[in-house]
Amino acid sequence: MRFGVITLFPGMFDALWDSGVVGRALKQGKISLNFWNPRDFAHDRHRTVDARPYGGGPGMVMGIQPLRDAIHVGRAELGKGCRVLYLSPQGRRLDQAGLEALASNESLLFVAGRYEGVDERLIEMEVDEEWSIGDYVLSGGELAAMVIIDGLARLLPGVLGAAESAQQDSFVNGLLDCPHYTRPEVIEGYRVPPVLLSGDHKAIRRWRLKQALGRTWLKRPDLLSRRILDLEQQHLLAEFIREYQAEHREPR
């Protein structure tokens, strides 16, 4: 998968090359990542990329010409079918389903805005989709681009150490992930749940599903409201709720 980023600060992405899932995907050649700085496309000697907004108001707005020229070069280099994504609070909110939809593209070009944003006409003329990573404001779109690139890299075959890791992540099946444990078996009185030591794979699968359902019920009930649970899931969730309420019932 090919990625490109239009950014004033390409150095922010250096950490992606050196570590984690994205670094592994880059080294394996599963993804490519290129950058275009709008300042390199400015026509004046000061390499100006912003100007005061029409109508007044605080801050500066990124102008069309340097961004548009950078997008044209990026599109050409990333190849046919490249989609241009502008990262902004007004965009579609990112979730796992959104990542899976974006993963169907061969190449994506992210436009990372700064200041008060970009001239609206650039969005109308050049942008295919707007995306947001949440209802809050960042200093620019670079961190949002990194979030999306990381999420997409995880979905590519062969990138994660274990093939099933991505399928067990939170949100993949519309639920939060179950708890995980490793050595030691006991620490300061806190024990690993016995079922995980039993070797009974059917019981382990059932426990993990129950915990995922219960954790979602406790922490993100909105996710459950969007799902239709099958009979097993209904029984496991009811069992979790009974156990939880019994454990947390206040003494009379």
UniProtKB/Swiss-Prot annotation:
SUPFAM superfamilies hit by this protein: alpha/beta knot
GO cellular component entries: cytosol
Coiled coil: none
GO molecular function: tRNA (guanine(37)-N1)-methyltransferase activity
Keyword set includes Methyltransferase: yes
Enzyme class, broadest EC rank: transferase
Catalysed transformations (reactions): guanosine(37) in tRNA + S-adenosyl-L-methionine = N(1)-methylguanosine(37) in tRNA + S-adenosyl-L-homocysteine + H(+)
EC number: 2.1.1.228
Keyword Calcium: no
Job of this protein: Specifically methylates guanosine-37 in various tRNAs.
Name this polypeptide is given: tRNA (guanine-N(1)-)-methyltransferase
Lineage summary: Bacteria, Pseudomonadati, Pseudomonadota, Gammaproteobacteria, Chromatiales
